[in-house]
Amino acid sequence: MLNAVDAKLTTDFGQR
């Protein structure tokens, strides 16, 4: 669960 959230957050940060 945390992995998925971390991946999403990382992607969001990377895109931003």
From Swiss-Prot:
One of its GO terms (biological process) is photosynthesis. It is found in: Cellular thylakoid membrane. Keywords: Electron transport, Membrane, Photosynthesis, Photosystem II, Thylakoid, Transport. One of its GO terms (cellular component) is plasma membrane-derived thylakoid membrane. It comes from the Bacteria. Disulfide bonds: none annotated. It is a peripheral membrane protein. One of the extrinsic, lumenal subunits of photosystem II (PSII). PSII is a light-driven water plastoquinone oxidoreductase, using light energy to abstract electrons from H(2)O, generating a proton gradient subsequently used for ATP formation. The extrinsic proteins stabilize the structure of photosystem II oxygen-evolving complex (OEC), the ion environment of oxygen evolution and protect the OEC against heat-induced inactivation. Belongs to the PsbU family. PSII is composed of 1 copy each of membrane proteins PsbA, PsbB, PsbC, PsbD, PsbE, PsbF, PsbH, PsbI, PsbJ, PsbK, PsbL, PsbM, PsbT, PsbX, PsbY, PsbZ, Psb30/Ycf12, peripheral proteins PsbO, CyanoQ (PsbQ), PsbU, PsbV and a large number of cofactors. It forms dimeric complexes. This is Photosystem II extrinsic protein U.
